UniProtKB/Swiss-Prot annotation:
Stated name of the protein: Large ribosomal subunit protein uL24
One Gene Ontology CC term in the entry: ribonucleoprotein complex
GO MF annotation terms: rRNA binding; structural constituent of ribosome
Keyword Flavoprotein listed: no
Gene (name only): rplX
Organism (species): Synechococcus sp. (strain JA-3-3Ab)
Subunit and partners: Part of the 50S ribosomal subunit.
Family of this protein: Belongs to the universal ribosomal protein uL24 family.
């Protein structure tokens, strides 16, 4: 597993190569894809099940439908307009979710297998269900 660089290592890279690398240019290996069904395993929304709407590999976060709902109080932008309260999903860290099998109704870790035709596919470790 590749570990993310520490800030001191990034500064050393910049000095050695002369190339400016920003910390946010690092990308994490995401085992969860858009459209996957996941279950939240920790935090305020523990136990909730939802579909992944978006993946953010630079921040190692995912946006899950119906999870981590935040409320925004918006001021009126124009004269005569009234303020409003908006709610929407906010991203959560990828380590807080596990893939969920709808057939077996169980959350599981992810493994990888190579099929007979040479494709690398994701597999649920508990059930053996192939995802890709």
């Amino acid at each position: 597993m590749v570990r993310p660089l520490k800030p001191s290592q990034i500064r050393r890279l910049i000095r050695q190569t002369g190339v400016r690398k920003h910390r946010n240019s690092l990308r994490y290996k995401m085992r969860i894809k858009k459209g996957d069904t996941v279950q939240v395993i920790s935090g305020d929304d523990k136990g909730k099940i939802g579909e992944v709407l978006q993946v953010f590999p630079e921040r190692n976060m995912v946006l899950v439908e119906g999870v981590n709902i935040v409320t925004y109080h918006r001021k009126p932008q124009r004269e005569g307009e009234s303020g409003r309260i908006e709610t929407k999903e906010a991203p959560i860290h990828a380590c807080k979710v596990m893939l969920y099998s709808k057939k077996q109704e169980v959350a599981s870790r992810i493994g990888y297998q190579i099929t007979a035709d040479g494709r690398k596919v994701r597999v649920l470790k508990k059930t053996g269900e192939i995802l890709d």
